[in-house]
Amino acid sequence: MELEVYWVWLNELRGLPLKAKRKLLENLSNPRDIFHASLDTITYILATGSPHATSVAEGSKEPAYTSVWTARSLEVAESILTNHNKHNIHLLSPHDEHYRHMYAADKKTPLVLYYRGRLSDPDIPVVGVIGSRSCTSYGELVAKAAVKDLVGQGNIIASGLSFGIDAIAHKTTLKCQGVTYAFVPCGLHKAQPASHTALMEKITDTGAVITPYAFGKEALPFRFIGRNNVLASWCDTVLVIEARTKSGSMNTARSALKKGKHVLAIPNSLLTPSSSGTNQLLAEGAQAYLNDRLLLCESADSNPVLGFSSQQSEQAIIKALRTGALTTSEIDTFVQDRDLSVMEYLSNMELADKIMFRSDGRWHLVGGL
C-alpha cells in the first residue's frame, strides 16, 4: 500500500515521457526510489547510452526536466488515492499478477491501471467483443450468439461500455452469468456514457471496470485511443462484430493486430456501411468469423458436412427466400434441425454464395438459385 502513492505520482508526472519512466524503473527498484533519487542520478540513468552521456552526467548541459524534478510532490497522487479509497477503486502496477505480463509485453501500456470490482484468475482467457455504436439487427444477433458461446466456453468477455455492440456484449455476458470487463476512457468517478451507470455497477458485482485514467479525468478524444490500446493489450482475442472504416473499433482491432493478438471479423455485404471496416480488417490479416463454433480455433475449411435434416433445412430456407427477402427471425421458423443454430445455417450459406445479407436488414437469395 505504501508504494501506491509513488506509483500514482510517477504515472501522473508530467514532463517525463513514458519511455523515460520505464527506463528509470528498469534501473531503480521501485517508484519510491525514483522519487527520492537525486537529479544527478536521474540524469545519468536517462542519458546512459546516448552520445552525450558523459557531458550530461557532469552537468555541462541542463536536462529539460530539471524544473519538473525539483518541483516534484506527492500532493496530486495523495489526492487521487484519497478519492480512490472513498470509491473502492484499486490500482494495478507492473508488480501485480494481473498486469505484469501485459506491462512487459507492450512498451506503450501505462505504468498503472485503475479498476473497480473484482478481477478473475489471470490465466482465464479474455475475449474482446467490440463493434459499432449503431449496430444493425444482424450485428446484434451475431454478438449475442457469439458472447453466449464464448461465456459457455469459460471466457471472460471484455468491451468498452459504449452503446451498441459494447452494451450488448456486457449485458449478454451478465445474462449468461459470465464475467465481463469494461474498459473506459475516463476516471472511475463516472460511467461513460452516463446512461450506462447502472450497467457499470452491475458489471462490478462479478467483473471489473478498468481504466488507465485516474479519478476525475474526463473522457477527452485522445483518451478513447488510450483506452482502446489497453483493451487490445488485455485481450487474448478480439472479435469485431460490425465497424465502419473510421471508428474506434477499427482503432482497437488494428492495435490488437500490431500486438500479435488473435483478431476475428465478421464478413458481410460490401453494400453494408456498418461492415466496411470489418471487411477491411479481413484484408489486413484478421481471421473471418464464421460461426460461434469456429470462433477461436477452427478455420474456414472445417465447416461440418451437412446431414440429411440439415440439407432439408437449407432447402426450406432457399424455398422461402424465393418468395422474397426475410429477416433472420423470419427464417428461423424454417429451420428444422436444431443441432445447428439459424446463424450457423445462414453463415454457411452466405460463405457458399447462396444468400447474402443486405443493408435492408434482410437475407436475399444470390441470383440463379
Sequence positions of predicted segments:
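Short, small/acidic-rich helices and loops at N termini and domain boundaries
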Residues: 1-98, 352-369
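Glycine-biased, small-residue-rich flexible motifs in mid-sequence functional cores and linkers
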Residues: 1-4, 93-369
